[in-house]
Amino acid sequence: MKLRPRDVISYEGHDYVVEGVLTYKLNGKSQALARAVDDEKVLWVEPMVGDSDDRVVVFREVQDLTLGTPPPTTIAYRSGSYVPRFSGNAQVTVDGLIADRPAGACDVWRYRAAGDLYLQIERWPHKTVTLAGESVHKDMLEILPAP
């Protein structure tokens, strides 16, 4: 599943328009994260990597978890205990318009907890962002390609 600007993602009764897609190049791998918006609701969607995948990670930016960087080795958040999955300095490219995420370097820390729950902490030159999300089956989303 490749997401592009202006695609529409239907999820949980809302239609989100993809404003842009960030591609993180980290540890020899590329990982995409699409910013999708429905009025004031914002999702960050990590599409499946390959045809054999059947899960998509859906993130939301959170304000109730304040962490320094680098973050600790274990994070307790919303009754989950998160452990590191990967981290490093990523080179980020932007396709579309994402005002507060410029192309360039960003430090990234990804954590995982039981129940396919995830945290992603990003340290940009101008701010630190925390995303919390969960892995959902691909059939929970409907993707309508941009015209």
Where in the sequence are the language-model features?
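Mixed-charge, low-complexity intrinsically disordered regions
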Residues: 1-147
